[in-house]
C-alpha cells in the first residue's frame, strides 16, 4: 500500500467535502464508484478513516488550527491549505500509526505539490505549533 498516494487522495476528497455539501461517507462512496481510479495500491481504510475522522472532529480541528494562527482567520485560508492542515492535525491528534513529525513533513510535501511556495512556511509554522501544543 502506498501511504503517500493514499494521502494525496485523502487531500483531494477532503477538499471535495469542503467545497460540496457531501458527507464523508458520500464522498468516499463516490470515490469508490469511480472506475477511472486504480485503487490497487491505496490504503482505503486510511482514506476512509481520515475522511470520517475529519468530519467527526472538524470543530475541534478548526479550533486548534485557528488558535495557532497569527493575524489570520480560518476563513482566509485557501480550501486546499485548510484541507492539508485538517489532515495533518487529525493525524497528530488521532493517528497512532503516524508520528507527528512525519505527518507535518507529508503536509509540507502536499503543500509543495498542490499549493504555492508561500504556503509551505505557513503550513509548517501552524502545524509545528499544533504539534508542540499537543505534545
From Swiss-Prot:
One of its GO terms (molecular function) is RNA binding. GO terms for biological process: DNA-templated transcription termination; transcription antitermination. Pfam families: NusB (PF01029). One of its GO terms (cellular component) is cytosol. Keywords: RNA-binding, Transcription, Transcription antitermination, Transcription regulation. Gene3D superfamilies: NusB-like. SUPFAM superfamilies: NusB-like. InterPro entries: NusB-like_sf, NusB_fam, NusB_RsmB_TIM44. Signal peptide: none annotated. Belongs to the NusB family. Involved in transcription antitermination. Required for transcription of ribosomal RNA (rRNA) genes. Binds specifically to the boxA antiterminator sequence of the ribosomal RNA (rrn) operons. This is Transcription antitermination protein NusB. It comes from Clostridium perfringens (strain SM101 / Type A). The gene is nusB.
Amino acid at each position: 500500500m502506498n501511504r503517500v498516494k493514499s494521502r494525496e487522495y485523502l487531500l483531494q476528497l477532503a477538499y471535495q467535502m469542503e467545497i460540496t455539501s457531501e458527507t464523508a461517507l458520500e464522498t468516499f462512496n463516490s470515490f469508490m464508484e469511480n472506475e477511472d481510479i486504480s485503487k490497487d495500491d491505496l490504503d482505503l481504510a486510511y482514506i476512509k478513516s481520515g475522511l470520517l475522522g475529519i468530519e467527526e472532529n472538524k470543530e475541534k480541528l478548526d479550533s486548534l488550527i485557528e488558535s495557532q494562527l497569527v493575524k489570520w482567520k480560518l476563513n482566509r485560508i485557501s480550501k486546499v491549505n485548510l484541507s492539508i492542515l485538517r489532515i495533518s492535525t487529525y493525524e497528530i491528534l488521532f493517528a497512532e500509526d503516524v508520528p507527528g513529525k512525519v505527518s507535518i513533513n507529508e503536509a509540507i510535501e502536499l503543500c509543495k505539490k498542490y499549493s504555492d511556495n508561500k504556503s509551505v512556511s505557513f503550513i509548517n509554522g501552524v502545524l509545528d505549533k499544533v504539534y508542540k501544543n499537543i505534545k
